[in-house]
Regions:
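Acidic, Ser/Thr/Pro-rich intrinsically disordered cytosolic tails and loops
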Residues: 2-230
Length: 230
């Protein structure tokens, strides 16, 4: 047996070993990131600022907001893990507000991004997007992942995912209010907004045109200043 012939099985074994190692390493990484998002606690400053802005919210309401921000992070994580790098729009005004406040805690936010996504999660305001259709596409992507995570059929939804329903449930002023198409009546002031199952009050759509669709995108992590206090 020649040397080259005897080396080939060894090379193939090394390649196979590397593939197996990468597969299980990825599984461990996914499990670790998922567990981190489930367990991490937002800084106290975020809750304090939300209560100042929305004084009618109680502790349970704030917990619901935090839960849905973490759910949005899971939606991003899951989408990226499945190879989808397209941006995902934020459907909730109150959750977006919590996200904004968390970003101001620069050190904590940067650490969360690194441990949850492996890179920095940028917040892209709707105003910087090219057109409303771009925001719409991002919202549809969020809708599909949110529905799948809650066992809802995206194209035949019997209920709204919690992330889409939260603003109305918490009675947030000038909120993003979604209803299912089957609830719309002919001639009512309802127009399509996300997937074909979801509609948005046309007045609110116009009123919130500059806010709907804040989105997330991952990129390189730059330096940051100090974090916020508890």
């Amino acid at each position: 047996m020649s040397l080259s012939t005897s080396v080939i099985p060894l090379i193939l074994l090394c390649i196979l070993g590397r593939i197996v190692y990468q597969y299980f390493s990825r599984k461990v990484c996914i499990k670790r990131r998922k567990a981190y998002i489930d367990a991490f606690l937002l800084p106290n400053r975020v809750a304090r600022k939300l209560k100042e802005r929305y004084p009618h919210l109680d502790e349970r309401n704030i917990s619901d907001v935090f839960r849905e921000l973490k759910e949005y992070f899971h939606i991003i994580r899951e989408s990226k893990e499945n190879g989808n790098e397209a941006f995902l729009s934020m459907p909730s005004q109150i959750v977006d507000g919590a996200w904004h406040e968390f970003i101001l805690c620069t050190r904590e936010y940067a650490e969360c991004c690194q441990r949850a996504f492996g890179r920095f999660l940028h917040h892209t305001p709707a105003e910087s997007m090219r057109n409303p259709a771009q925001m719409q596409e991002g919202l549809e992507r969020t809708w599909r992942v949110a529905c799948n995570r809650e066992g809802i059929k995206p194209n035949d939804a019997a209920a709204l995912p919690r992330l889409f329903a939260l603003d109305a449930v918490l009675e947030i002023p000038d909120c993003h209010h979604y209803v299912l198409n089957r609830e719309a009546r002919a001639g009512s002031a309802l127009v399509p907004v996300a997937p074909r199952d979801v509609t948005l009050d046309s007045e609110k759509k116009i009123h919130h045109a500059s806010h709907i669709g804040c989105s997330a995108g991952c990129g390189g992590c730059g330096g940051g200043c100090g974090g916020c206090g508890g």
